[in-house]
Amino acid sequence: MAPPPLLPVAASTPILHGEFGSYPANGPRFALTLTTQALHIQRLRPKPEARPRDGLVSLDEVSGCGTLQSRSPEDTAAYFCIYTYPRGRRGGRRRATRTFRADGATTYEENRAEAQRWATALTCLLRGVPLSGDQEITPELLPRKPRLLILVNPFGGRGLAWQRCMDHVVPMISEAGLSFNLIQTERQNHARELVQGLSLSEWEGIVTVSGDGLLYEVLNGLLDRPDWEDAVRMPIGVLPCGSGNALAGAVNHHGGFEQVVGVDLLLNCSLLLCRGGSHPLDLLSVTLASGSRCFSFLSVAWGFLSDVDIHSERFRALGSARFTLGAVLGLASLHTYRGRLSYLPATTEPALPIPGHSLPRAKSELVLAPAPAPAATHSPLHRSVSDLPLPLPQPALVSPGSPEPLPDLSLNGGGPELTGDWGGAGDAPLSPDPLLPSSPNALKTAQLSPIAEGPPEMPASSGFLPPTHSAPEASTWGPVDHLLPPLGSPLPQDWVTIEGEFVLMLGILPSHLCADLMAAPHARFDDGVVHLCWVRSGISRAALLRILLAMEHGNHFSLGCPHLGYAAARAFRLEPLTPRGLLTVDGELVEYGPIQAQVHPGLATLLTGPAGQKPQA
């Protein structure tokens, strides 16, 4: 019986096609087709399937790949392995590894070359390197691995950041072959101090594993350097392990994934980080009442939202649920605030990002940041992950390709030790193929240091580092705010002013206010505007609750509530006229009083992964 025709591939160019076996050797055989969007799998023998189950592996679900070899010297086959994170029936992701046997040649060297050809092609596609069907696939096509500095706040959210980082983040980015150093922060503004003295030429990106507060420290540290114009071009990223995780929610939305929270959001953002790619990021330069200045990537809030944010700190152990509880309490004691909001309306044309700050998505390797000014002082990297083999959990491999763990296979070459369900005591450690991950200029894979065996001890009184809510340190460097007159000076005539009683005022840059609150559904990372939302007094508690509930899916503006207002602006000034209240910038409490801000389009660079996919069910 002739095998069925090949499955129709996606509307993209086929890169490779071939026949592979599985492990063990007497298992099924498969026809594999690699396109720019997916790996197509069709079983050929013993029973061909016209539409095999799990026959399409989207590259959006793949973190990395590798080649393996048998521990048996008589086995001349080589093995091609991919690490995937498909969505389960309940929506969450689960790790699955698929392994295929390259056995079409008579010698191990030839089979190994074929397995490496597939691994090289898949790695190039994952990292954004364009390939064509008639192109020769060689290791020289592989981009250099970016070297990432990963900062973990072990006190963030519910205090689970370190454990989640080791359980989910480290294994995935190790599978992707990324090079990184892992550092635990130990106090407030520790991350800011680190990046202020960082040698930028040693890194291609800084990633925070926490909530939005740690990235706020990093961003303001980069902009508080004499070489801020170079420093702010350092790509920054966030892996959510905090309470709000607003920017991570926006990154998840930008990547085309459905809205999720918790570990699912962490896995989605980790996958996007592994894929590479970045996007220009607008920043707000915020001038406070004292004249000091800080920079925001998220929001300025006054009224109900800032009250909920700050007053819910006492429920920090609840994680993101603290905001729900805080909102309920806030609705029960709803306050109004008198103030004056003035803004410079955005032009009809979208603002263009600053030239030179955009990273081409076609090349996944990150642009090297320029070296810092000679005057910068290098701070020691405390609790760094740097010098010992990095443990990488390896659960059982699943079909198609490998229906069971592979006790008799090992990854080719030498490198970090991989532990898990790969055999009994005395088996050789698993290690990545040295020819696969990178070109000859590749950086060394990250490794673990003895001082990073666990998170620092948390205060016994509360279990978490108590937030100080002191005013953030002001930045003395940064771009000129050419749209803003000094606070207290009259505003130009082209500004619009609204005065009255407000329940809340929000100026937000990205789409999300929390991981599951889409406050500005049409916002983009580089649209050049701040999205102003306000709610006037007179609104009922029920109507405000409806707005908050609709905000989960970004439908609040379609409610037609007359108390809800919106404007897109390039700059704004907020003057609270009520003597007492709370103001927050990116969730951090700042001094109360007049405040103004200006958008600086595309000033920073955000690690986002590829964009353009539709939300996945």
Swiss-Prot record:
Its main location: membrane. It comes from Mus musculus. Keywords: ATP-binding, Cell membrane, Cytoplasm, Endoplasmic reticulum, Kinase, Lipid metabolism, Lysosome, Membrane, Mitochondrion, Mitochondrion inner membrane, Nucleotide-binding, Nucleus, Phosphoprotein, Transferase. It catalyses: a sphingoid base + ATP = a sphingoid 1-phosphate + ADP + H(+); sphing-4-enine + ATP = sphing-4-enine 1-phosphate + ADP + H(+); sphinganine + ATP = sphinganine 1-phosphate + ADP + H(+); (4R)-hydroxysphinganine + ATP = (4R)-hydroxysphinganine 1-phosphate + ADP + H(+). Its cofactor is Mg(2+). This is Sphingosine kinase 2. One of its GO terms (molecular function) is histone binding. It is an enzyme of class 2 (transferase). The modification Phosphoserine is found at residues 358, 364, 384, 386. Catalyzes the phosphorylation of sphingosine to form sphingosine-1-phosphate (SPP), a lipid mediator with both intra- and extracellular functions. Also acts on D-erythro-dihydrosphingosine, D-erythro-sphingosine and L-threo-dihydrosphingosine. Binds phosphoinositides. In contrast to prosurvival SPHK1, has a positive effect on intracellular ceramide levels, inhibits cells growth and enhances apoptosis. In mitochondria, is important for cytochrome-c oxidase assembly and mitochondrial respiration.
